[in-house]
Amino acid sequence: MFCVQCEQTIRTPAGNGCSYAQGMCGKTAETSDLQDLLIAALQGLSAWAVKAREYGIINHDVDNFAPRAFFSTLTNVNFDSPRIVGYAREAIAMREALKAQCLSVDANAHCDNPMADLQLVSDDLGELQRQAAEFTPNKDKAAIGENILGLRLLCLYGLKGAAAYMEHAHVLGQYDNDIYAQYHKIMAWLGTWPADMNALLECAMEIGQMNFKVMSILDAGETTKYGHPTPTQVNVKATEGKCILISGHDLKDLYNLLEQTEGTGVNVYTHGEMLPAHGYPELRKFKHLVGNYGSGWQNQQVEFARFPGPIVMTSNCIIDPTVGSYDDRIWTRSIVGWPGVSHLEGDDFGPVIAQAQQMAGFPYSEIPHLITVGFGRQTLLGAADTLIDLVSREKLRHIFLVGGCDGARGERNYFTDFATSVPDDCLILTLACGKYRFNKLEFGDIEGLPRLVDAGQCNDAYSAIILAVTLAEKLGCGVNDLPLSLVLSWFEQKAIVILLTLLSLGVKNIVTGPTAPGFFTPDLLAILNEKFGLRSVTTVEEDMKQLLSA
């Protein structure tokens, strides 16, 4: 086992990365190794998808499957070894079908990629785990060095984050053949184990640029189906009655669940990255979408244990449900998996609803506590002139984007302390689950404009980018000249690709934390600092002083 893709990875003087019987996320060595094997199979599939396009062959089933299966290897998504192997077998079957199509056009068609002919050696998981050792990401570290390995992983993990957003977009009917072509090209190239530093740096920027397009079509999918988010108050306390909790990012799953629970007497609560769903008109119209429950994903083993109803996980993040003994009432969807828990195939939530009706639910309603969400792209752009006016009248000094992933590390209290230390004449724009560090606190307003503005899920970084570009255009300056600072918390691969997106767009002087990615060497950190001004958090006082004086 070698996995260094998330922020909580093991860090020792001897090196970074989880390499024992179990990773910090709870992933076993078996599952981790089989995910490496799956990635190799997907690289072979992408290699033939690239070749097929040379013959004018585009298979949408392949284009849809490849990023979805890659998504299953993202942190806290799928811990179920047999399902991981199932994805690998499906990838190989699709690859062979593509290969046959190419050969039907050109009898001499061939693919030079080293992953292009990969076959699984056995049906036995132990044998497959031994085969997977050939594809451990750090297997040639001694030959290539830590810097090249770090850049390879930056590209692999960044592409993994983009693949997740591609799947979210596709679920909503949004896709782009040019994006698929670019994805396959990069995925296939990474399967050649590249070792050119400049080429890898260029690839990282290409992934960022590609992901900007992915976030654009994802934004289009969400707003076309569910309307543009508008500011909405959400209750974060319990309401009497039977209940279901839904977590993850998939708004379509939430919509289907709301449709199917309407009139049943079962209330629905959002959790984690589902919180922004309350801002969408077509979702909040359901009166039994009664509120948001819980806090950051890392607290779920305590909070889910206390929730008196079933729980549906639509995407990341799931952690061991046996710890809180709620594994008999947690349900996984799509690419999510945990051994032994119930998995929903298709869009029928009937079994979940039946379980909710058999459970007690909340015995009474608590005193409401309302927070505001729903500052989507349209709302943000509508406020651009107000922001400019406040800046011109020296009522608004600075905007801080404080957001990103949450996690268990104690150092993440930095982001709470930072948000509460922001001066009263400054605004806080937030997104993703890092907001749970401070989103239930009171921040007041500036001439009626809330000082805490919740822009949505992690992918809604797109809205923040569009706002920044609009403000810069109206003020006749560059984005980096705005009174705007980005203070980002990271945890997994979606955060990595959003960072690459920002860097590829030329955004500089981003501050990240609580720690640097474990695959970043001192040399790579120095390169990113020199090229982009990227740096790690220090202390709240020092960072605040530096950002306000920039």
From Swiss-Prot:
It catalyses: A + NH4(+) + H2O = hydroxylamine + AH2 + H(+). Hybrid [4Fe-2O-2S] cluster binds at residues 249, 273, 317, 405, 433, 458, 492, 494. The keyword Iron-sulfur applies. [2Fe-2S] cluster binds at residues 3, 6, 18, 25. InterPro entries: HCP/CODH, Hydroxylam_reduct, Prismane-like_a/b-sand, Prismane-like_sf, Prismane_a-bundle. Its EC number is 1.7.99.1. One of its GO terms (molecular function) is 2 iron, 2 sulfur cluster binding. Its main location: cytoplasm. Coiled coil: none annotated. One of its GO terms (cellular component) is cytoplasm. One of its GO terms (biological process) is response to hydrogen peroxide. It holds the Pfam family Prismane. Its cofactor is [2Fe-2S] cluster; hybrid [4Fe-2O-2S] cluster. Keywords: 2Fe-2S, Cytoplasm, Iron, Iron-sulfur, Metal-binding, Oxidoreductase. SUPFAM superfamilies: Prismane protein-like. The modification Cysteine persulfide is found at residue 405. Binds 1 [2Fe-2S] cluster. Binds 1 hybrid [4Fe-2O-2S] cluster. Gene3D superfamilies: 1.20.1270.20, 3.40.50.2030. It is found in: Cytoplasm. It comes from the Bacteria. Catalyzes the reduction of hydroxylamine to form NH(3) and H(2)O. Belongs to the HCP family. PANTHER family: HYDROXYLAMINE REDUCTASE. NCBIfam families: hybrid_clust, PRK05290.1. This is Hydroxylamine reductase. The gene is hcp.
